[in-house]
Structures are given as C-alpha cells and as structure tokens.
Curated annotation (Swiss-Prot):
Modified residues (N6-acetyllysine): 338
Upper classification of the organism: Eukaryota, Metazoa, Chordata, Craniata, Vertebrata
Species this protein is from: Rattus norvegicus (Rat)
Main location: nucleus
Subunit architecture: Monomer. Homodimer (via the T-box); binds DNA as homodimer. Interacts (via the T-box) with NKX2-5 (via the homeobox); this complex binds DNA. Interacts with GATA4. Interacts with KAT2A and KAT2B.
Keyword Cytoplasm assigned: yes
Protein name (record): T-box transcription factor TBX5
Tagged with keyword DNA-binding: yes
Ranges annotated as biased composition (Low complexity): 34-45
GO process terms (BP): animal organ development; atrial septum development; atrial septum morphogenesis; atrioventricular bundle cell differentiation; atrioventricular node cell development; atrioventricular node cell fate commitment; atrioventricular valve morphogenesis; bundle of His cell to Purkinje myocyte communication by electrical coupling
Post-translational modification, as annotated: Acetylation at Lys-338 by KAT2A and KAT2B promotes nuclear retention.
Task of the protein: DNA-binding protein that regulates the transcription of several genes and is involved in heart development and limb pattern formation. Binds to the core DNA motif of NPPA promoter.
Domain notes: The T-Box domain binds to double-stranded DNA.
Length: 517
C-alpha cells in the first residue's frame, strides 16, 4: 500500500510545473494563500482518460483560507493526531454505477526545512529525506459513484504521526517541514482494487490545504484559530492569546508524574514556617531523644507542646537515627520519663527505642497476685487458705481434665534448648510440658486479655524431665527454666482461646517460690 502510488503513476510532488499544466476541466488555481471569489471552486491537478467530468469541491474552504493566510500548522505526535480543519470534499461527475476508490496521501510541498522566528516562518535548511509514501484509503472504499456523490466525503479519521516505525497506517511526517495533501479518485478494477497499469484515476490538489508539521503550535494566531473553530477545544475559550498559546505548547509535551510525598517534602523545606514548625512539633514521647542529642536537660512533660498532627519528614529521620549509644550516654536517671533499653536487643544495629517494662524478678508475690486478680480474667480460688498461693493452686478450665494438686504431683521441669524462631501461641503453648505444671482449672470462661498482660518470646523443648516433689520441696522458678532473653509487647491479641490464655498466664504470672517456701 505504501508503494501503490507508483503502481498507477501518481506524481510524487503535486506542485511540479508539468502537473499544473495537466490541469483539466477546473478553474485556474489561485495563488498560494490568495482568497478566491468562488469559495467552492474545484481544483484538479491530474486527470486520466475516462475520468473527465469529475469535479471536487473543498468543504469549509473559507476556514482553510483563514489558516492558510496565517500559515497552517498541523500537530504530529507519536500516537497520531487528526487534522484540523478536517479534510472534507464534495464530489460530482462520477458514474453512479461504477465503483470508485477514494484515497489520500500527503507529499512534501518543497525541499526546505522551516523555523518560526520573529513571528514568521523562514527557511532554515534543506529538508530531511522524505518518509516512504503512505496512502490513506477511505473506509467506504470501494463504493459506487452514487454513494460518493450522495454526501460529503470526510477524511477526518486520517492521523499524522512522527513515528517512523508506526504500525497503524498513519501518515508519517517530519516536523518543521511543509506538506501538501492530495486526493485521488481511482476507478476500481474487476477485483475491486487498484494498482494495475490500466487503472484510471485522477488527482485533485487544493493549495490552501498545505501546512507545516509541528510537534507544538508555533504561531499563537494558529492556536487562537484552532480554539475558536475546533468544537473539541471549548475548554480553552475565554483565555487570552498568550495563555492559550502557552497551554497549547504544554499539552504537546510529556511531563513526569511527581509523587505527592516529594511535593510535600519540597513544600516543607521551602516554607517560611518550616523551621518554626519543626521546633514546635516535637511530640511528648520524643522529647527526651532530642534533648539527649542536644545535651540539654529536658523540661517536664507538661511543658512539651502538643504533638503535631502533620509531622514533617525531618522528624522521622531524627527518630530513626537515635541509636543505642545515645541512650547509654543519657541515662534514665537523668531523664526519669525516658524508658531505658532492654538488656538484650535483637541486634547491635537496633536503631529504634524499645520501651522498658518492669521485670518479673523485681515484683513481689503479693503485687503480682493482686495484678493478676485485676485482669479481665478473674481467677476463682477454691483452695483452703493454708495453701501457699491460693489464687493459682486450684485452677481449672472446661477444656482440660482435672489433675492432682502440686503437693502430690510429678512436676515436669523444662530443659532449656537452643532458641527457635518465634511461633504463635498455639504452636508452643498447647503442647504437653506446660499443661502438667498447672493444677486443675476451675470452670470459667476465658474473657478478654487485659492491657497489662505479658507474653514471652521463647520456644522450649517438649521432652520433659520428671522428678518427685513433696510438700516441702519448692517449685522451681519459671525464670530459671527459660532462656535469658524475653520480649514483652503491648500488642497482645484480645481474643485468645482458653488454653492459650491460661498458658501465658501460668508462665508469665506464676510466683517465684524459693526452696524454703
């Protein structure tokens, strides 16, 4: 299809002297850009034998002349852009029963390259090599002469592109080059095609349709004309000429998408209030960190300003760069409201603060028993008062069988093993070694877990070591049966099953008994 014009002898450039001399049954061509008295005067460049009497009239010729007087520009894009004004013609003189094929091509008007400077177009050099010629065949082709003469023939779906590898059949053009559209009327052969040597055709050229291909409008007058007459550009109407010209140039370019976070960061950096906001946006739980870095004794929490609901990006960088070394330099005694690090952190490069929590060894039995009674799970004691720990002596759950008391049972000691990765409670608290350590549980449901409950992160072996214990033999402290590293968190699930809940409570809250108790 690209080389079909050579098949039936189409001239490469329509403005050659010989092609002008071969003009047939049409009025003389007007000068380039000069208005004609007859707005519907047909123009023809070449006619073969058998195609006499065919006349073509350009639709909206007055509009084309307005653009031509200023210097028509057509946008070309990689994806393809339609022409405006659209190329529409009225055809007469066809044989109503003969089938015709209507097609267009766009050829270079000259061998120059142009530039727009000082509000005018001027030649800047020699033209680049022309792209391989492409023909745009009207979608209704082939059709009878009666069909073509019944209504306007529109080529508004024709698109212009600057993509030299375009696979969609668009017309390929070079930017800043002048082109001339041409209309070809071809008599279809017996196969409803064309291209043979005996194919009859005629070519029609309208000089006022010549244009310069551009990637963005150069002349603001063309921009204004397009906006005033293009029904798809209504959104730009009502603005001044310079603004419309600027917007039209911007629309033809591709700009990168800037993330919102980058915009916020730049606004925060360049805002005249950014430094003041940073100084006043320190939250109460981060005040000790900044005071530790600056070496200034911190005020009380009441003097700290309220937290900023929109923290800046600089605050986060300061938070995550507080290291353990800074915490050691600024002890907890210097800032009583600053909670110290735990004794063992997961790694040496731990760059965030862990809140310190009261350890089991520092709590008395009465305090821990009282705190256990204050939890959402209220323990019901059914043992006599003479027992050492009545609140943990006879506890039962409706899902476990009752067991003998501690005074006559075989106690299962847990042997510490190598640390295993963290598992959910259902994985290492529902097995055998911890269940015999608990006495029979009283019948009660498992309510929600309170905020102050602790959980530990450790995994133990499930191979028990059995020893006999009498009433005088104390129960080994759970702290001595576990590895030294614990991790306490506040985010404990609130809907644990009964066995999970009591396993955690039995291990984390059981009193420490010495050998003399």
């Amino acid at each position: 299809m690209a080389d079909a014009d050579e098949g039936f002898g189409l001239a490469r450039t329509p403005l050659e002297p010989d092609s002008k001399d071969r003009s047939c049954d049409s009025k003389p061509e007007s000068a380039l850009g000069a208005p004609s008295k007859s707005p519907s005067s047909p123009q023809a460049a070449f006619t073969q034998q058998g195609m006499e009497g065919i006349k073509v009239f350009l639709h909206e010729r007055e509009l084309w002349l307005k653009f031509h007087e200023v210097g028509t520009e057509m946008i070309i894009t990689k994806a393809g852009r339609q022409m405006f004004p659209s190329y529409k013609v009225k055809v007469t003189g066809l044989n109503p029963k003969t089938k015709y094929i209507l097609l267009m091509d766009i050829v270079p008007a000259d061998d120059h390259r142009y530039k727009f400077a000082d509000n005018k177009w001027s030649v800047t050099g020699k033209a680049e090599p022309a792209m391989p010629g492409r023909l745009y065949v009207h979608p209704d082709s082939p059709a009878t002469g009666a069909h073509w003469m019944r209504q306007l023939v529109s080529f508004q779906k024709l698109k212009l592109t600057n993509n030299h590898l375009d696979p969609f059949g668009h017309i390929i053009l070079n930017s800043m080059h002048k082109y001339q559209p041409r209309l070809h009327i071809v008599k279809a052969d017996e196969n409803n095609g064309f291209g043979s040597k005996n194919t009859a055709f005629c070519t029609h050229v309208f000089p006022e349709t010549a244009f310069i291909a551009v990637t963005s409008y150069q002349n603001h007058k063309i921009t204004q004309l397009k906006i005033e007459n293009n029904p798809f550009a209504k959104g730009f109407r009502g603005s001044d000429d310079l603004e419309l010209h600027r917007m039209s140039r911007m629309r033809s370019k591709e700009y990168p998408v800037v993330p919102r976070s980058t915009v916020r960061h730049k606004v925060a950096n360049h805002s005249p209030f950014s430094s003041e906001t940073r100084a006043l946006s320190t939250s109460s739980n981060l005040g000790s960190q900044y005071q530790c870095e600056n070496g200034v004794s911190g005020p009380s929490q009441d003097l700290l300003p309220p937290p900023n609901p929109y923290p800046l990006a600089q605050e986060h960088s300061q938070i995550y760069h507080c290291t353990k070394r800074k915490d050691e330099e600024c002890s907890s005694t210097e800032h009583p409201y600053k909670k110290p690090y735990m004794e063992t952190s997961p790694s040496e490069e731990d760059t965030f603060y862990r809140s310190g929590y009261p350890q089991q060894q520092g709590l008395s039995t009465s305090y821990r028993t009282e705190s256990a009674q204050r939890q959402a799970c209220m323990y019901a004691s059914s043992a006599p008062p003479s027992e050492p720990v009545p609140s943990l002596e006879d506890i039962s759950c409706n899902t476990w069988p009752s067991m003998p008391s501690y005074s006559s049972c075989t106690v299962t000691t847990v042997q510490p093993m190598d640390r295993l990765p963290y598992q959910h409670f259902s994985a290492h608290f529902t097995s055998g070694p911890l269940v015999p350590r608990l006495a029979g549980m009283a019948n009660h449901g498992s309510p929600q877990l309170g905020e102050g409950m602790f959980q530990h992160q450790t995994s133990v072996t499930h191979q028990p070591v059995v020893r006999q214990c009498g009433p005088q033999t104390g129960l080994q402290s759970p702290g001595s049966l576990q590895p030294p590293e614990f991790l306490y968190t506040h985010g404990v699930p609130r809907t644990l099953s009964p066995h999970q809940y009591h396993s955690v409570h039995g291990v984390g809250m059981v009193p420490e008994w010495s050998e003399n108790s």
